[in-house]
Design a protein with these regions (language model features):
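Short, acidic/polar
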Residues: 28-40, 84-91, 151-161, 209-212
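Conserved anion-binding
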Residues: 12-14, 18, 93, 97-172, ...
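Conserved, mostly hydrophobic/aromatic
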Residues: 11, 39, 47, 79, ...
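Hydrophobic faces of well-ordered beta-strands that scaffold small-molecule active sites
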Residues: 4-10, 19, 47-49, 77-81, ...
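A structural motif
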Residues: 43-45, 97, 167, 220-221
Length: 252
């Protein structure tokens, strides 16, 4: 049985870690390098670093900050945000990044997924999907540019396509749950997992340790992402893992 992962997420804007609710009302959390070191020592299984400032403007990769962050870690580091090309991916991997997360660029240029997986190995390629539930259409649709632009692409179709193109992992953020701390979108995540065979990281809604237990008891996702509850010290990685053990879930 595969051990489940708990992954802190650093949403970085202009060199600072920020957090909001449903992608809005961002507030400053701290220095990404300091937080990376903290979570590395706190028992995190991996770390996700998302440069959300690059969803609005195509500025250069935040290489210095990313490299400084990677040097603090003895756990895998995934970086996403504004990655547009194989050269961008090469640069990140050469500066200590273990996996890259593609979002809007994957939808714009789906062949980038195939090219990247063939060049670097699919284990390096994570596809991030910001999923929005449209009440009128009663379905989930893919959003781009940090959740600001709604597309007509059904999430359930897109996850299957990116797996076929060579994605090695999915990072699914349920936008209507993001920052709400009311639990993960269990039904949505379970349905996605039925459609694909690659690992899924669940994001959006984790408000306490019990929510992670429920996530892993009711879905077969591989990992749960946490941000504000860890940044605000409402719980810790170890408390989440202890609760998971009590629930009979294997942890690393």
């Amino acid at each position: 049985m595969i051990k489940k992962r708990v992954i802190p997420c650093l949403d970085v804007k202009d060199g600072r870690v920020v957090k909001g609710i449903q992608f809005q009302s961002l507030r400053d959390i701290g220095n990404p390098v300091d937080l990376a070191l903290f979570y590395n020592e706190a028992g995190a299984d991996e770390l996700v670093f998302l440069d959300i400032s690059k969803t609005e403007a195509g500025h250069d990769l935040m290489i210095e900050v990313i490299e400084a962050t990677a040097k603090q870690l003895f756990i895998p580091l995934t970086v996403g945000g504004g990655i547009q090309s194989l050269d961008d991916i090469t640069q990140l991997l050469n500066h200590g990044v273990d996996k890259v997360s593609l979002n809007s660029s994957a939808l714009k240029h789906p062949e980038l997924i195939r090219q990247a997986s063939e060049k670097f190995g699919r284990q390096c390629i994570c596809i991030a999907i910001d999923s929005f539930y449209d009440k009128d259409r009663k379905d989930y649709f893919y959003t781009t540019h940090g959740g600001k632009k709604l597309t007509d692409v059904r999430v359930y179709d897109w996850v299957q396509e990116v797996e076929h193109l060579g994605a090695g992992e999915l990072l699914i953020t349920s936008m209507h749950h993001d920052g709400m701390k009311q639990g993960f979108d269990i039904e949505h995540l379970a349905k996605i997992k039925q459609l694909v065979n690659i690992p899924i990281i669940a994001s959006g809604g984790g408000g306490n340790a019990q929510h992670f237990v429920e996530l892993f008891q009711h879905t077969d996702v591989s990992a749960g992402l946490a941000a504000s509850i860890l940044h605000d010290q409402e719980t810790t990685v170890e408390e989440i893992k202890d609760k998971m053990r009590e629930g009979g879930i294997l942890v690393r």
